[in-house]
Amino acid sequence: MTDETTKNGPDATAADAAADAAAYVENDTVQEETAQPDPLELLKAENSELRDRYLRLAAEMDNLRRRTEREVKDAKSYSVAGFARDMLAVSDNLRRALDAISPEAKATADAGLTSLIEGVEMTERAMLSALERHGVRKLEPVGQKFDPNFHQAMFEVPNSEVPNNTVVQVVQAGFTIGERVLRPAMVGVAKGGPKPAEAETNSVFDEKDA
């Protein structure tokens, strides 16, 4: 055999195949190493996801806390609504008793009647004060623009000196409890006066907090 035959013989072919196989394995190993994600990047991604979950959970807990506080506050504020509404009937009767006494009768009343009148007035004031301590407040609508959210119009009063729909008389007092109307005020409103100003009026609650 010649040297050329020896180089190109079966041994050379086997050596080439082995070299190709080794190169393939090495290349595949490099590709696998390249395809594996960076552990640091994985930790960063996991940390970011956990942080997002924490922020969402914190926001949900804060909303739950606020909602619970509001519900507890409302429960305390409005738990006496039924009782307060019943007490308004008593207050109405006290006011009717006082209104039934004319100014002339008061002026000429003897000591006994005067004491009785003063006692009823003190009782009415004490009752309103007790209701106010529990968040029940009396509306004072005379002179205000009629607001159907707080007033119930019973009749119209011809009056050219004040704007139309101005409350000029209260038939039955109205009350609020917290941010709600416990009972609207029954009122008489002016008719025949100038057109009311277009400017917006503050609500009863805004005026109370001012």
From Swiss-Prot:
- Kindly indicate whether the keyword Transport belongs to this entry: no
Q: Which GO terms describe its molecular function?
A: adenyl-nucleotide exchange factor activity; protein homodimerization activity; protein-folding chaperone binding; unfolded protein binding
SUPFAM superfamilies documented for this protein: Coiled-coil domain of nucleotide exchange factor GrpE (SSF58014), Head domain of nucleotide exchange factor GrpE (SSF51064)
Extract the InterPro entries matched here: GrpE (IPR000740), GrpE_coiled_coil (IPR013805), GrpE_head (IPR009012)
Q: Which CDD domains does the record cross-reference, listed alphabetically? A: GrpE
Localization (cell): Cytoplasm
**Which keywords are on file for this protein?**
Chaperone, Cytoplasm, Stress response
Predominant subcellular localization, coarse grouping: cytoplasm
Q: Which GO biological process annotations does it have? A: protein folding
Answer whether the UniProt record assigns the keyword Heme to this protein.
no
Q: Show the GO cellular component annotation of the record.
A: cytoplasm
Query: Which Pfam families does its entry note?
Result: GrpE
> What interactions and quaternary structure are annotated?
Homodimer.
Q: Which family does it belong to?
A: Belongs to the GrpE family.
Protein name as catalogued: Protein GrpE
- Species of the source: Rhizobium etli (strain CIAT 652)
Q: Which gene encodes it?
A: grpE
